[in-house]
Amino acid sequence: MVSPENANWICDLIDADYGSFTIQGPGFSWPVQQPIGVSSNSSAGVDGSAGNSEASKEPGSKKRGRCESSSATSSKACREKQRRDRLNDKFMELGAILEPGNPPKTDKAAILVDAVRMVTQLRGEAQKLKDSNSSLQDKIKELKTEKNELRDEKQRLKTEKEKLEQQLKAMNAPQPSFFPAPPMMPTAFASAQGQAPGNKMVPIISYPGVAMWQFMPPASVDTSQDHVLRPPVA
């Protein structure tokens, strides 16, 4: 049997020469070996290149950050300048509108004061025109009402005129110059006529008390000279 004092008994059984390969007691460690085909110089070169690349990236990133910040600042300033230019143009245009004949003012506060004054004046004139328009509308309504009343009055007067014309035509119509033939007289009236030969009134039943000679001239009706002009026959 192998005595426990000899700790290298395994090496005696292996027919290979490993050089410095030794077996140590408790607490031994294996030596760190390099990968096959890779030298220590190449690994050092890789580490060095990685460090150089990182070092080269840091200044570039700082430059890009500064460029981006400067470009953002310049674009903001450009936008602000454009906004101010547009605002100045608006003020110049407003000043030219407020005072067409005079050169435009450069004081923005004065331009705003003039604009407020002009707006207040125009608002007052607009209110006056609105009130005048409402009063004119009321007058138009009143005139329309009077027009309708006058139209009704005109129609009424026209109707009365037509009635008066019809009445006037009826009054101016020619009257008949003769009377209809009287009916037969009774015998009592005939005997009365014989007893009163000088009576010129002939009783008519339809028209009692009407003289028959009413349409003859007075000279023809006069009988005072009959005994001279027409003597009775002997």
Curated annotation (Swiss-Prot):
What organism is recorded for this protein?
A: Arabidopsis thaliana (Mouse-ear cress)
Q: Where in the cell is it found?
A: Nucleus
Q: Which GO terms describe its molecular function?
A: DNA-binding transcription factor activity; protein dimerization activity; transcription cis-regulatory region binding
Q: What is this protein called?
A: Transcription factor ILR3
Domain bHLH per the UniProt entry, residue ranges = 71-122
**Keywords linked to the UniProt accession:** DNA-binding, Nucleus, Transcription, Transcription regulation
Inactivation phenotype: Plants are more sensitive to IAA conjugates.
Cystine links in this protein are none
